[in-house]
Amino acid sequence: MAKLSKRNRAIREKIEAGKLYPVEEAVALLAELSAVKFKESVDVAVNLGVDPRKSDQNVRGASVLPHGTGKTVRVAVFAQGAKAEEAKEAGADVVGFDDLAEQVQGGEINFDVVIASPDAMRVVGKLGTILGPRGLMPNPKVGTVTPDVAQAVKNAKGGQVRYRTDKGGIIHCTVGQVGFDTNAIKENVEALIADLKKAKPSSAKGTFFKKVTLSTTMGPGLSIDPASLVM
């Protein structure tokens, strides 16, 4: 407990309450405060001006981050014929159809993203009770049900993140790791915000971007000055 208390004191001494941090300063400070033995993720929380109780104001989609997240992503693709070959060439880790469905039903789920060609949904649809709770069910809204499986694989491997408003109207995403170049984190956040802007519900009124917060896996959250971002 002594170490934890010492770290908490150090954090309190470094952070200014109520301050809006330029994104560059926030990234540098989060890296300075990181004191764990593993490589922490850098995460962003974006408070949106939506009413999550209304179905037409739920914001959901995907964004390809220009500098990726730093994580290795294993991709499974449900496709057959030429589409299966395209998926393999694009770098998919697992490609199959009925055989892949049998693996999933048998509990063999060693992947992070599932992509399906539209014709494969008759097979994938039966796996909803298995894939759904794990957040792996393909969905056209986030680009994981698509005829262009090759591009979807490249997106997933290249740092695509999926987002969805929670009950508080907040989007949570990983935008890199401690040790990333400051500008890379900034550009990843800006890419996400640009896509969120495109996804703004027409029924959402008032200020859409209410607050942006950067944090690390085990670190504090720092409120970001919107003037330091292209929004």
From Swiss-Prot:
GO terms for cellular component: cytosolic large ribosomal subunit. InterPro entries: Ribosom_uL1_bac-type (IPR005878), Ribosomal_uL1 (IPR002143), Ribosomal_uL1-like (IPR023674), Ribosomal_uL1/biogenesis (IPR028364), Ribosomal_uL1_3-a/b-sand (IPR016095), Ribosomal_uL1_CS (IPR023673). It comes from the Bacteria. One of its GO terms (molecular function) is tRNA binding. Transmembrane segments: none annotated. PROSITE patterns: RIBOSOMAL_L1 (PS01199). GO terms for biological process: regulation of translation; translation. Pfam families: Ribosomal_L1 (PF00687). Keywords: Repressor, Ribonucleoprotein, Ribosomal protein, RNA-binding, rRNA-binding, Translation regulation, tRNA-binding. NCBIfam families: rplA_bact (TIGR01169). HAMAP family: Ribosomal_uL1_B. Belongs to the universal ribosomal protein uL1 family. Binds directly to 23S rRNA. The L1 stalk is quite mobile in the ribosome, and is involved in E site tRNA release. Protein L1 is also a translational repressor protein, it controls the translation of the L11 operon by binding to its mRNA. Part of the 50S ribosomal subunit. This is Large ribosomal subunit protein uL1.
